[in-house]
């Protein structure tokens, strides 16, 4: 339901779509750019069954679906400037700590990006993740988490870091975003209506955790990233849903 459309404009010639499964069930899918060692987006469903209280793993691991040569060794230690940047989950541990195998797969190094720890990863970003988890306790929602180095047509300086146990240069995202979907279906399971909302953050420290102030439409995030989100919705449903820019409208759908 939540997979973005295949990119055909040649913008990311080194990117591959990778499906991560656990016990025959799809856990999440990520669009991994081997040139930047970055998952440009990570898409996953979220419902009550995915969340629980399994203890957080201590170590990360390589993604077995990709060669280690195109991954950054963040297995045992983080980035060289780890006082500032941490391994920021794209699909959070707390969104998969109800099923052990799925949880461990969120600790693949490909499910991380360098993220400011203080007042971002541990602040507004974490608060948004918790809000989405709260909604998903009562219904299934569909999420795409992404990174961007620049908006479409924008010129932006990119800063790089390295891992303590690797020499590969890793670009630090200038933006992080999420787009989220809820659907309503008829008795035959056909989607009859939907609600979406997006969140777009400049990658910096925030003095508060009021994530709702950064809610925008999915249409706007599509314009900034060049990705087409939720293409599996019926066209009329998608067009109506992707104009919403209010968190409360999404919550109350």
Task: Label each residue range with its predicted role.
Residues 1-253:
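Domain-level detector for secreted/extracellular nuclease and nuclease-toxin modules, and
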